[in-house]
Every structure is written in structure tokens, then in C-alpha cells.
Amino acid sequence: MTNDTYLKTTINKSRIGRLATVDLECKPHVIPVVFVFDNDRNCYFIPIDEKTKRSRPENLKRVKNIQENPNVALLLDEYNEDWTKLYFIMIRGKGSILGGKKLEQNEMRLLEKAHKLLCDKYPQYQKIGIGKYLIKIMPQKVVVWNNDG
């Protein structure tokens, strides 16, 4: 398996990641997220879904942080008692918020594609709804580590 194939396979099988953002005071904020990778656009989408939240989507800490500082990291990892099967993938990149009331046509198509990818990977979204906002990550650096012995 080539490195590129290994990377795509591992990313696509990962069910959860951890999104790291930073506020203006350089205080980190890390949360668990679901995500999809869009092969056509070489970017990641993270929904701001309709599960219960403490505040409106536009007021969430992750959203405000990305609006103030677009530098983000998405960490995907696997823990196994057999340490030869451990891995992590860290994607560093620029985050942006898609969605809201005033959408351009190309943004609408992008949201529709992301929603389809997310519903395909996570069928739970057919019941709870994905929401009107997404985080888009354009990767700048990908760090891969595994211990496959």
C-alpha cells in the first residue's frame, strides 16, 4: 500500500477527530468532532450540527476562534492495546466557516456536497440534521505517525 493510499484509507475509516483552535489570547480549545474528507477539493468538513449546544452556532467558541484566527489542527488517532497498531494523523491548516443566511451559489453547492458526504459516513444525520454551518479545513501540512512494526 502506498503512503497516499494508506493515508486516504486511514482518514476515511476514522470516525472521530479532535479539532484544535486558538483564540486571540493564544488559549487552545480542543473538542471531539466528526468529519469527512472531500477528495475532489482536498479539504475537510466538520459539521456544526443540530445536536444540543449551549449557544447558537455563530457564538460557539470554535466558530469565534476560527473567525479570529484561522489556524487549526485536526487530530485523528487510534489507540490499541497492541501498540504496533497505534497511529495518529495531524492535519494543520486554515479553517473557515461556511453557511448562514447569505450564500453564494458555489458555497451552496459546496454545502450540499459536504452534507451528502457526511450523511453517507454518519447515517445518524438523517435523523438529527447536519445544520446550516460547516467548518472547512484546507490542509497545509499533514503529519503521519504509525507504529506498525
Where are the regions that the model predicts?
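A short mixed-secondary-structure module that forms the rim of ligand-binding clefts
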Residues: 39-79
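A short, well-structured catalytic beta-strand-centered motif of the EAL phosphodiesterase domain
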Residues: 33-37
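A short, Trp-centered hydrophobic/proline-enriched beta-strand micro-motif
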Residues: 11-23, 72-76
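Short Pro/Gly-enriched beta-strand edge/turn motifs at strand-loop
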Residues: 1, 13-19, 117-119
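General beta-strand recognition
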Residues: 18, 43-45, 73, 136, ...
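Charged, gly/pro-rich active-site loop segments
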Residues: 2, 57, 79, 83-149
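Soluble sensory domains of the PAS superfamily and closely related sensory modules
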Residues: 9-12, 66
